[in-house]
């Protein structure tokens, strides 16, 4: 069996400096 892909939570956008 193939391992299930781990669900990565959406990352917040980087603050524009």
UniProtKB/Swiss-Prot annotation:
Keyword Secreted attributed: yes
Single GO BP term: innate immune response
Gene Ontology cellular-component terms listed: extracellular space
Superkingdom of the source species: Eukaryota
Annotated keywords: Antibiotic, Antimicrobial, Immunity, Innate immunity, Secreted
Compartments it resides in: Secreted
Induction remark: By bacterial infection.
Record-stated family: Belongs to the apidaecin family.
Function statement: Antimicrobial peptide active against many Gram-negative enterobacterial and plant-associated bacterial species. Not active against other bacterial species like H.pylori, P.mirabilis, B.pertussis or N.gonorrhoeae.
Name of this chain's protein: Apidaecin +
Species this chain originates from: Dolichovespula maculata (Bald-faced hornet)
Lineage of producing organism: Eukaryota, Metazoa, Ecdysozoa, Arthropoda, Hexapoda
